[in-house]
A protein has these predicted regions:
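Short glycine/threonine-rich loop-to-helix capping motif typified by GTGT followed
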Residues: 376, 402-406
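Thr-Gly-centered strand-to-loop micro-motif
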Residues: 364-365, 422, 441-442
Length: 509
């Protein structure tokens, strides 16, 4: 009579997420024990580990690497001279695993011709905009496009019904790529449509990050989806007892429907993103819908990732847009950034906007953990007289990172940057808007992981009507925020020391 409750209990606790967490914890404990056991009483081994740490420090000094990242590791090695060098060898390499890097580069190089720039698409841009567009198409390489309609959504629950409508209209294919997919109201609504469309013969594919979705999906998720003819790729699977490194996650949020419609932004496929579940107060996010020529960039981004792991297409032409808006609303340039190369594309786009701004730059970001170059760019823009405003969460999802974000407030405020905290809840949007003619909406946080370690995406809008829509959203959000003053930033000596340590180690958090 107790069999069913017992089965339910064990099935609940013995899921993949629980097993993974337990195995990782055991692995960490085992490594610490092994380190203690092997070094105790072995003077020669202690000396060898210290020598390794010195060599790693010298290597970092010479390495062409982000300075904040190098300093963070040098500080950690200095604090832990016995363990620091070994920790860097285990966790410090920014480059993705060789297999992952080789697969993705091979596919991207094979399809470079699919992204050939067309000068006529940028002939309406001014010199500054053309320079930025040229940079993204050269180092992305993702060209800019006219003949694209855009619609900005100031929250996830505004986007969700429109997304469902577009999914219902799909006739040829649906591509989805997300960091988080979690069972619940939002995913249930999408899944029902995907299953129905797959049964009708629509090509339905899903890429989701295995680490990001670890706690939100059942262990048999892929099997269930494949049985419904929804093909899946769990990106960079988490394998405990093989690697503890959780870097190089697929943080992108992309939907492509029939090659004609695309979505991106900060919204994942989980209930908190549409406020069907309250976690940290009201969840403020942002997304954008594109229709027309620029959708092609997102189609290629998705297919490159898909074919790196499940080779299928050599010709992307059947997935090209078949419908273009009659009128052109500015220029749109979707792009992606990845750790596959040494080009910090996402950071450079943000830096360029700050450097070229004349009147204002308004920024949404859930986290602020940046290097000196980004910090100086924010301060310099404000010192030039540009109205620089940062909007961050009032209720954090990660308290340590929230404290780290606040540790940047004093130098920014002294330079003239205005900082706001969104008091109704958690702000998860990642947007830049400047001078009524330039904006970015995407998945890219202002932290080290987004800017250097993860696969990210965004859409640059040049002189598009939705630039104004984003500006108006920021201005409507500011009255709901608390503006931070210098007097709010007083802290105790221990607090100041903690903030300094967090700043030094910020690239590692």
């Amino acid at each position: 009579m107790f069999r069913l409750p017992i089965v339910k209990f064990f099935s609940r606790i013995l899921n993949r997420a629980t097993i993974t967490i337990v195995l990782v914890a055991l692995q960490v404990l085992w490594l610490l024990w092994a380190f203690w056991a092997f070094t105790t009483g072995r003077v020669w081994l202690n000396g060898l580990l210290k020598a390794l740490s010195i060599v790693i420090v010298l290597y970092l000094v010479r390495k062409d690497e982000n300075s904040a990242y190098k300093i963070g590791w040098i500080v950690l090695i200095g604090l832990l001279p016995l363990l620091g060098g070994a920790l860097y060898l285990a966790f410090g390499n920014k480059a993705p695993a060789k297999g992952l890097r080789t697969r993705m580069r091979k596919v991207e190089q094979a399809h470079t011709a699919d992204l050939t720039p067309r000068p006529d698409q940028t002939d309406t841009l001014d010199r500054v905009e053309k320079n930025l567009s040229h940079y993204v198409e050269t180092y992305g390489p993702y060209p800019a496009w006219k003949h694209t309609a855009a619609h900005y959504f100031p929250c996830g629950e505004a986007m969700y019904p429109r997304l469902l409508e577009d999914l219902e209209r799909a006739e040829k294919f649906i591509f989805l790529e997300f960091f988080i997919v979690k069972s619940g109201t939002m995913w249930d609504g999408i899944e029902a449509i995907l299953k129905r469309k797959a049964a009708e013969g629509v090509d339905v594919r899903l890429i989701y990050d295995d680490f990001g979705s670890l706690l939100g999906l059942p262990s048999d998720f892929v099997i269930r989806m494949e049985r419904s003819h929804i093909r899946c790729i769990p990106f960079n699977p988490v394998v405990p007892l093989v690697s503890l490194v959780m870097n190089h996650r697929d943080h992108r949020k992309i939907v492509v429907i029939d090659g004609n419609v695309a979505y991106t932004g900060g919204v994942n496929l989980a209930d908190e993103y549409i406020n069907a579940e309250q976690r940290f107060g009201y969840w403020k996010d942002a997304a954008i819908r594109l229709e027309g020529a620029a959708v092609w960039n997102f189609t290629v981004i998705f297919l490159n990732c898909w074919n790196a792991f499940r080779p299928q297409e050599t010709d992307y032409a059947p997935f090209a847009p078949t419908h273009l808006p009659e009128s052109s609303d500015g220029v749109v340039q979707p792009y992606t950034d990845s750790p596959l190369d040494e080009e910090p594309l996402a950071e450079t786009v943000y830096l360029n906007i700050l450097a070229q701004a004349q009147r204002y730059v308004y920024i949404y970001t859930p986290y602020l953990a940046v290097g000196e170059e980004m910090l100086d760019a924010l301060k310099t823009a404000a010192k030039r007289g540009v109205d620089v405003r940062l909007v961050l969460p009032g209720i954090p999802d990660k308290k340590l990172v929230f404290r780290l974000s606040r540790s940047y407030y004093v130098p920014l405020l002294r330079a003239g940057v205005r900082i706001y905290e969104y008091t109704p809840g958690f702000l998860h949007a990642k947007c830049y808007v400047s001078d009524d003619h330039l904006a970015v909406v995407g998945s890219i946080n202002m932290d080290y992981r987004s800017l250097f370690l993860h696969f990210e995406c965004g859409a640059l809008l040049y002189s598009n009507s939705q630039v104004i829509a984003l500006r108006e959203d920021v201005l409507a959000t500011l009255p709901q925020c608390r503006e931070v003053q210098l007097s709010d930033c007083r802290t105790s000596l221990p607090g100041t020391l903690l903030d300094s340590v967090l700043r030094l180690l910020s690239p590692l958090l």
